[in-house]
A protein has these predicted regions:
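Sec-dependent bacterial lipoprotein signal peptides
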Residues: 1-19
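Beta-strand-dominated extracellular/periplasmic modules and repeats
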Residues: 21-141
Length: 141
């Protein structure tokens, strides 16, 4: 699970880097709430939307302490590509002084099912304009 989360975070950083800087890549915005087993996701869960259509730019967001997120292409451009998107989730590990990875306190115990990480089967449609897309993660087997 740790390696998959690292891969997901690595892919996020890669996609952010290749999209570059800009002001607006689309007229679509996406906000919402992520819940895990019915309760709000803790601060720091990464949400990624990858357009199914070739050539689309991925978007990402991080949950706040109430589970809310807002998608952005990079630090200066908010938004998401309209159309069908693959949605995936991840958590970002930090490193201590010795380089040992650990999860920050709010993310300890967070379980993201493998099918919602890399190669996720979850899809959501983004309409032009403002979108409110709430996302539910269930950890039940």
């Amino acid at each position: 699970m740790y390696q998959k989360s690292i891969v997901v975070v690595g892919l996020t950083l890669y996609f952010v880097a290749i999209t570059g800087c800009g002001t607006s890549l689309t007229d679509s915005t996406v906000t919402g709430v992520v819940t895990i087993d019915g309760g709000p996701a803790p601060e720091g869960v990464t949400v990624m939307f990858q357009p199914v259509k070739a050539g689309g730019s991925p978007s990402y967001g991080k949950t706040d302490s109430q589970g809310r997120y807002e998608l952005q292409y990079n630090a200066s451009a908010k938004g998401a590509n309209s159309g069908d998107n693959v949605v995936s989730f991840g958590v970002e590990y930090m490193e201590d002084e010795e380089g040992v990875p650990f999860l920050p306190e709010p993310l300890k115990g967070v379980k993201i099912p493998a099918e919602l990480q890399e190669n996720s089967s979850l899809r959501k449609n983004v309409e032009p304009g403002r979108n409110e897309i709430d996302l539910e993660i269930s950890t039940a087997n």
